[in-house]
């Protein structure tokens, strides 16, 4: 056995190098810390110069307030800061930095020089991170921080750095995140003295366009809402513009870029019904909340936060984004007054227009699925009786009679008998305007699968099964939302072993569990008894269901498992209950489906995230036939 080593205080340099291991991971980490200091100093113009991807040099110049010469040595001292003075200030901190560790940590693993000049000073002052000697220097008002030879003093850390190109890419990412949070600040980036990026002061929308490009902005929906002390604004992509990678997801809490699982879970919930496969939404969201309601002192790099009431934040974000996505269909699907050539370069030219900022006004009472028997979708058209047999469930959910479910399926009006293959001449009616009928008027059915329609912009092609599937699905969801959630009492409670933290969750979230349809009680210090569950899920694995709900509650403070399970069931029902391919529809039936799509939320995608319709403008069609060329 080796001899015991006595306890000793570590040298300051080693302490700073250990701290640097938590904060300084690569050149991009250095750049982030320096940029945040510049923002806190009130800078309105920041210039960044890199060499070797930031490995050899990172120089950041700002026009902020500067540092007085007598405070320069303190700037390189650990835990010295101008941002906070007490615990109360820490708990409500609004600045980007507050720990007082960044510059000291950087100086311990690289050569660092600071040149700073306060406003009104005759000249600038300079300090070297090694000698800590302060000397006169020349320079404009503001601060320049020059970092060279990163990790030369810690060779083991330098071995983990990637190529110059890779590290430069990370530096660009770090700068983009800061630039998106502060559009009022001008940024310039040089690499080996070559200009790489330049962003002028702008509003949030223009800065997002400047940083992420028109390809991103042309396919987004604006988000803006507030409730009490919490507000959310920004942009989220339309479902049809979702990406294969989660690489364009920017969340800012009180101006600070963070990665938060509560908000991420809320966004996934909002997109649950409209994303296809494993596609990922892109977004730039700014969440403003009372600084006292969020803890930013979770990680030295300040990439994580902790909300005091994570459940409330989750519900707010999920509801706001969900309502934004819901309003993309219907009357806003094809904007009026858009030039023919203005269709975006998206996967589908018929993507919906951006909804107006803010929460949409409540819609009118939800209409019946289709016009009642004997009623035509267009006034003046002959009424036809319907003969479609209602869809029947093979096995209805426990606790809900089959007749209740079947009543949710309203048949298409009109005779279901196959129509003549020849296109009948439709009555001469004026072409509806975009305001009246955005999806236009049906012309014909193609291969028993698609509906061809004409609107004020051009040609609309609708996948009738996918469209009807979404309509029926939304009707089913709304019908269930309007009724009390049935609960199934268990004859014999299901008791299972659980960790102490899960037992505590049951006690803490008793009210929320009851609202979800669960009755759970601790049956001992390490066991839980389930006495009742939602009737929809009564035939499932009760223990696995309970554990999954508790896992969600422990992770993000809320559980959407019941909603997800319910929606999965309703999606299957809607798929089987919607009009099938190769069914011949009359023009009245086609128009009835188009009208129903226009008033149905999320009608642009089916339940599986696939598009339900696409738009070709007259200009698009002219190009196909080389007209006007």
Curated annotation (Swiss-Prot):
GO terms for biological process: mismatch repair. Residues 371-382 have a biased composition (Low complexity). The keyword DNA repair applies. Pfam families: DNA_mis_repair (PF01119), HATPase_c_3 (PF13589), MutL_C (PF08676). The keyword DNA-binding does not apply. InterPro entries: DNA_mismatch_repair_CS, DNA_mismatch_repair_MutL, DNA_mismatch_S5_2-like, HATPase_C_sf, MutL/Mlh/PMS, MutL/Mlh/Pms-like, MutL_C, MutL_C_dimsub. Keywords: DNA damage, DNA repair. GO terms for cellular component: mismatch repair complex. SMART domains: DNA_mis_repair, MutL_C. GO terms for molecular function: ATP binding; ATP hydrolysis activity; ATP-dependent DNA damage sensor activity; mismatched DNA binding. Residues 364-388 are annotated as: Disordered. This protein is involved in the repair of mismatches in DNA. It is required for dam-dependent methyl-directed DNA mismatch repair. May act as a 'molecular matchmaker', a protein that promotes the formation of a stable complex between two or more DNA-binding proteins in an ATP-dependent manner without itself being part of a final effector complex. Belongs to the DNA mismatch repair MutL/HexB family. NCBIfam families: mutl, PRK00095.1-2. This is DNA mismatch repair protein MutL.
